[in-house]
């Protein structure tokens, strides 16, 4: 069983009209209350597999900061195990996303973990952490790995590039991580 259960939510399109987003957030809030009640009921049963599973509520509201702030306040009243900010990185600019986080995250309980869903570039992670986000998920690392991309202090490099075919240097000079200590650029290049 998983450690965290995410409550049902509706991720409204970033540019959806206000009326649609308000109805969507109301629906998400109702679903969250139902999820919490059902989890409480299930955890009262003797044969429940994982009574320690945490329930996270998901803040929604598209690009409307006032709707997101109101939703954050409402879901915080449910005293959940953690909170997520969803519905970002779906059409708005990075600056709009950061502005929404700046306005929304302060209304989520500081003592509870906060998760930014579907966002995971290195820059987005740093910006999110700076704004109070604790963890992230994204296809970015696995997609980049499949395509031979790694990040170094000098930026992103493509290990499948022909110039690394006979390069015996580590991925990052001076780095002591297992990959840099054990594998050369050439070895990773030929393992493509």
Outline where the language-model segments fall.
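Residues immediately within or flanking Cys/His clusters that coordinate Zn2+
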Residues: 174
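Non-catalytic, usually N-terminal nucleic-acid engagement modules in DNA/RNA processing proteins
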Residues: 1-48, 162-165
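Cys/His-coordinated zinc-binding microdomains
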Residues: 181
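Short cysteine-rich clusters marking metal-coordination/redox-active sites
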Residues: 177
